[in-house]
Design a protein with these regions (language model features):
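Glycoside hydrolase catalytic-domain context in secreted enzymes
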Residues: 19-705, 712-729, 750-758
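Short beta-strand elements
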Residues: 731-747
Length: 758
């Protein structure tokens, strides 16, 4: 009997050893990976789209994707949702915050952080674990369809605004996904276009923002983009994802692919892609085949599984979050309104603003039907949209009822017409609304009965297609005619005209900017845009936004402007130019794009070449004035410490954005930009006569330029000039400092061009 009991005990111990299964926690990830079968690993690293069987109906419609659960090991699914200005769901209402462009125009990290916190809070309410944002590609060209979603033409402004957004979201225990890495700067043929650029340009312009946000904020994930980079898909580039991102930048999180299955699966994993989204059964099968034939090593698959598990244990889903599906929309709306005011840019003001509540005539369909945000992954199903008309009424203006009735009826009709018009093809969201023709007689009559006129001009864009020069950058003849007639009649009556630019990116202004008395760039300001616009127009909030990109006089003034599909409209007739398997001879700017301007993107080109622009990078007016004094810059160890005192010299309370620009000696380089932004900040609200000293600390390493031949960063020895002031062309104060000896910093040799850019 004793022998039988002993045998049973031994069998129990053996079985326990064989069949014991670890349950995932923060401390046993290697053990869990070891316990996973090859099939489970192959399923695990391939994402699931929310409408795929057997998951259809389990997740909220519009969910971006989920991960594969393994219940026996305690591994849950986690949820990923768009987007950068609020959670994108098909049916559930969430807050539409201001777009990335407006956020960057605030030149204020706290604004980006508040928006991030708001999106993080709503993520918890809606059961989201990772928000697929921020989008932070450089505004290489004014016509990129997703410029509204991104931040700036400058990598420092982009990187630090992104970092603050990431800090805000992740402070709520929700992950982020910095995207799209890297050199993903056009929507035309976005799945297969080859971005061709030298490594100096890649490092100084197109990956610098990612470097800064990784080193300062460590996003939980980075999203690898669709495009080729110098002949290799970014998702298959080990040099990019492992060499640059992990080894050089120190990224510790997970690399997720942008949503496509048309890549070489083992190459993606070998390169450093950890989670393949949106996922398909064929990818899982390909992984298992690759393990068998040796094209994929188990150690690389284990690395991907490890990174995904490291992400999962941080998520709300793993920690037992119970989503309410009832976000605090009122609290978020307050944040949306307040942050929107911070990034609106006053471009012109000849005594028209601030305006007191009065009788007002509002022209332009977007005065009554405001564009809150763009299309695609950044579209948000918000509970409402406050138009400029509603915002001005809320502020006490009495609107011209004949115009209001005419425009609201037209807006309702055209919205319904566009909704069912098969010719309108947008990824998700709204469509551009054509302007209504208003007779000169009606305009003249309104000038007699109103005290001020507002004309709203709107432009929308979105994912999957770029803007067109003649249709989007230039205003149409009927729009200009409307503005001309309104200005003529109202000026004849001794009354002011204010233009509101409800726009997704730069537009041509030089041909008409002399007509109105004031121009306020409101961008795409989110659901509370109308109230925020009224706050700025009335002086309740003093405008403090500054342009995060240059507004050129002419589209072709920018170097490299012709190396972009500025007049390409996708249709069946030109599909052979887009898809690689159907290409005859690859078409320039569609199959590939030469970044021929090199590092001279935006203000770096215009300032270095003293080329005139409509409005320079960093430009923006205020209802008050500021003075600068006590500029000082010193090198202390590994950092440059700069400070300047800003004083409100005007009669109204206001905030001042301040850029810290540097002109560097050439060192071993034949050319460098005349100025480059290295840091920025914003004062608190200063009362008249009040001062504040802003201090910046910049690593000496951030003064460096990238030497492609030697694959290293070089900070030159010698005398540097520092400039203070947001406007890149108009410094308010300056100081000099010296770097006593040259300093070099090695970097991975990676992503070198295979074909020279033209």
């Amino acid at each position: 009997m004793k022998r039988l009991l002993l045998l049973n005990a031994c069998l129990t111990l053996v079985c326990a050893g064989v069949f014991a299964q670890p349950k995932l926690n923060e401390n046993n990830i290697p053990e869990v990976v070891k316990a996973m079968t090859a099939e489970e690993k192959a399923l695990f690293v391939v994402g699931i789209q929310q409408n795929a069987e057997p998951y259809r109906g389990k997740y909220l419609p519009g969910t971006g994707g989920v991960t594969y659960p393994i219940p026996r090991l305690g591994i849950p699914s986690i949820v990923m949702m768009d987007g950068p200005v609020g959670i994108r769901l098909n049916d559930n209402e969430t807050t539409c915050f201001p777009t990335g462009l407006l956020t960057a125009a605030s030149w204020d990290r706290s604004v980006a952080r508040r928006i991030g916190e708001g999106i993080g809070e709503e993520s918890l309410d809606m059961g989201n674990d990772v928000i697929l944002a921020p989008g932070m590609n450089i505004l290489r060209n004014p016509l990129n369809g997703r410029n509204f979603e991104y931040f700036s033409e400058d990598p420092v402004l982009s990187g630090f605004i992104a970092s603050a957004f990431i800090d805000g979201v992740q402070s709520k225990g929700v992950g982020t996904s910095a995207k799209h890495f890297a050199a993903n700067n056009q929507e035309t043929n976005r799945l297969d276009a080859d971005s061709r650029l030298d490594t100096r340009t890649l490092r100084e312009i197109y990956t610098k923002a990612f470097e800064l946000c990784v080193q300062h904020s460590q996003p939980w994930t980075v999203m690898a983009s669709y495009n080729y980079l110098n002949g290799t898909y970014t998702q298959e580039s080990r040099e990019l994802l492992t060499g640059i991102l992990r080894n050089d930048f120190g990224f510790r999180g997970l690399v997720v692919t942008d949503w496509t299955g048309r890549r070489n699966t083992p190459k993606q994993i070998n390169a450093g892609s950890d989670l393949l989204m949106g996922g398909s059964p064929s990818q899982t099968a390909h992984i298992l085949q690759s393990l068998e034939n040796g094209t994929l090593k188990m150690e690389d698959l284990d690395r991907a599984c490890t990174k995904l598990l490291e992400l999962i244990v941080k998520t709300p889903s793993f920690k037992g979050n119970r989503p309410s599906l009832k976000p605090d929309l009122a609290a978020s709306a307050k944040v949306a309104r307040e942050t929107a005011t911070e990034g609106m840019v006053l471009l012109k003001n000849n005594g028209a603003l601030p305006a007191k509540p009065a009788r007002a005539a509002l022209f332009g369909v977007h005065s009554y039907c405001m564009i809150q945000g763009g299309n695609g992954a950044a579209w948000v199903h918000s509970p409402y949209i406050v138009s400029p008309a509603e915002g001005l009424k809320n502020a006490g203006f009495k609107l011209d009822q004949s115009l209001e009735k005419l425009y609201t009826g037209y807006a309702a009709f055209i919205s319904e017409d566009l909704k069912y018009n098969h010719k309108v093809n947008v990824h998700v969201g709204d469509a551009q609304k054509p302007e209504l023709e208003i007779t000169p007689e009606l305009i003249k009559n309104t000038a007699l009965n109103n005290d001020i006129a507002f004309v709203t001009l709107g432009r929308i864009s979105g994912e999957a297609r770029d803007r067109i020069l003649k249709r989007d950058f230039l205003f149409q003849e009927n729009e200009i005619k409307l503005l001309e007639t309104v200005c003529e009649e109202y000026h004849a009556a001794g009354k002011k005209v204010v233009v509101l630019l409800n726009i997704c990116g730069p537009v041509e202004t030089a041909s008409w900017s002399d007509l109105p008395d004031a121009i306020l760039c409101t961008w795409l300001p989110g659901e509370e845009g109308g109230n925020a616009i009224a706050d700025v127009l009335t002086g309740k909030v003093n405008p403090s936004g500054r342009l995060p990109m240059t507004f050129p006089l002419d589209y072709f003034d920018a170097k490299g402007a012709d190396n972009f599909p500025y007049q390409f409209v996708s249709n069946k007739a030109n599909e052979s130019a887009v898809h690689p398997e159907r290409r005859g001879l690859p078409l320039k700017d569609i199959a590939y794009t030469d970044y021929s301007e090199g590092i001279y993107v935006g203000y770096r080109y215009f300032c270095t070449n003293s080329k005139p622009v409509s409005y320079p990078f960093g430009f923006g007016l205020s209802y008050t004035t500021f003075g600068y004094s006590k500029a000082s810059v010193k090198v202390k160890g590994q950092n440059v410490i700069a400070s300047v005192t800003v004083t409100n010299t005007g009669a109204a309370a206001g905030k001042e954005a301040v850029g810290f620009y540097v002109h560097a000696p050439l060192g071993s380089f034949s050319d460098k930009p005349s100025v480059e932004l290295k840091e920025f900040g914003k004062t608190r609200l200063l009362q008249p006569g009040e001062s504040q000293t802003l201090t910046f600390s910049v690593p000496v390493r951030q003064l460096a330029s990238f030497n492609s031949e030697k694959s290293r960063w070089e900070t030159a020895k010698g005398s540097y000039t520092a400039f203070f002031g947001a406007d890149a062309t108009n410094p308010e104060a300056e100081a000099t400092f010296k770097v006593a000896s040259a300093r070099n910093y090695s970097a991975t040799r990676a992503c070198e061009p295979q074909i020279g850019a033209n």
